[in-house]
């Protein structure tokens, strides 16, 4: 994809979130089942995925017993083909691996970087999943309204950075642009599908790995909506309309413009990932991180998102 088309798609998506922040946020309150599995794979706590699946988490609320780490200042692997089928954990550690993170209540605050944080619901999930944990949360998003509305009650332990992530990837500045100290965990959920181009998606994953300390973890989700016949059919229909409206050329394979609640002129760019693309993305950080797990979760089928969990090498 040429840079001009990529920028136009990013601008369409940014406009969508600015104009639909409230309605979008109202549909993004619950935790995803895959998040609990990610914590299990990081060995942060046992049985989280089962708790999420059973609905025992508190949707959209924060835990009253969460300790506060104090106000934060803003300026402050294994090859995927060796991992077996989705849902299997790869074998033992490779040379250069370090001990995995195991959270303990006596530790310093658990430092978490959430890139494309949206309304901050992953923080609320962590507060429920790790009761009593002090969490230092570094939130990055281009839609300030969406983030600030969701994180308003957590000002003491949240540092928010407004950043146009997609365009930072296009101009090659993403690693310099993210403002956060080395963290224990970096996540990016529900956003990789908004990034045009495989090279830019790989660049974001490398930036996430670079942001964590040795032994820290990275977890990302990759939307595979083409696996749903209903979603795939809608994507084809809305993309055809949007291309005419915006005068766009033919898009790359797997690229679509999705509508929103039957609203006029409300589109966002989305890429649906093939299994091969998931494997290719994992390979992009082979030298920097080991693949801890690859699995599928979420949606009506329990398989609309593909997750990758990594541990940074020493």
Spans of features found by a protein language model:
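Short catalytic micro-motifs in class I SAM-dependent methyltransferases
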Residues: 190-194
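A conserved beta-strand element that flanks and buttresses the S-adenosyl-L-methionine
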Residues: 187
């Amino acid at each position: 994809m040429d840079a001009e088309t990529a920028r136009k798609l990013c601008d369409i998506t940014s406009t969508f979130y600015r104009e639909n922040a409230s309605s979008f946020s109202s549909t993004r309150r619950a935790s995803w089942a895959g998040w609990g599995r990610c914590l299990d794979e990081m060995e942060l706590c046992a049985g989280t995925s089962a708790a999420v699946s059973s609905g025992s988490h508190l949707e959209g609320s924060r835990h009253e017993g969460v300790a506060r780490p104090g106000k934060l200042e803003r300026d402050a692997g294994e090859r995927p083909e060796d991992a077996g089928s989705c849902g299997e954990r790869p074998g033992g550690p490779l040379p250069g691996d370090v001990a995995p993170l195991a959270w303990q209540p006596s530790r310093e605050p658990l430092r978490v970087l959430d890139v494309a944080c949206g309304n901050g619901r992953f923080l609320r999930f962590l507060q429920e999943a790790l009761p009593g944990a002090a969490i230092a949360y570094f939130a990055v998003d281009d839609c300030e309204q969406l983030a600030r509305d969701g994180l308003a009650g957590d000002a003491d332990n949240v540092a928010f950075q407004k950043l146009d992530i997609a365009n930072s990837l296009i101009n090659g500045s993403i690693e310099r642009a993210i403002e956060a100290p080395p963290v224990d965990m970096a996540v990016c959920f529900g956003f990789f599908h908004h990034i045009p181009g495989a090279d830019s998606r790989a660049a974001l994953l490398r930036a996430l790995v670079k942001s964590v300390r040795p032994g820290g973890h990275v977890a990302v989700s990759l939307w595979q909506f083409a696996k749903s016949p209903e979603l795939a059919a809608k994507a084809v229909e809305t993309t055809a309309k949007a291309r005419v409206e915006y005068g766009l050329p033919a898009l790359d394979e797997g690229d679509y413009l999705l509508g929103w609640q039957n609203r006029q002129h409300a589109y966002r760019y989305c890429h649906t990932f093939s299994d091969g693309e998931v494997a290719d993305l994992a390979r992009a950080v082979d030298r920097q991180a080991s693949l801890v797990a690859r699995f599928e979760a979420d949606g009506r089928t329990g398989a609309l998102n593909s997750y990758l969990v990594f541990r940074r090498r020493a």
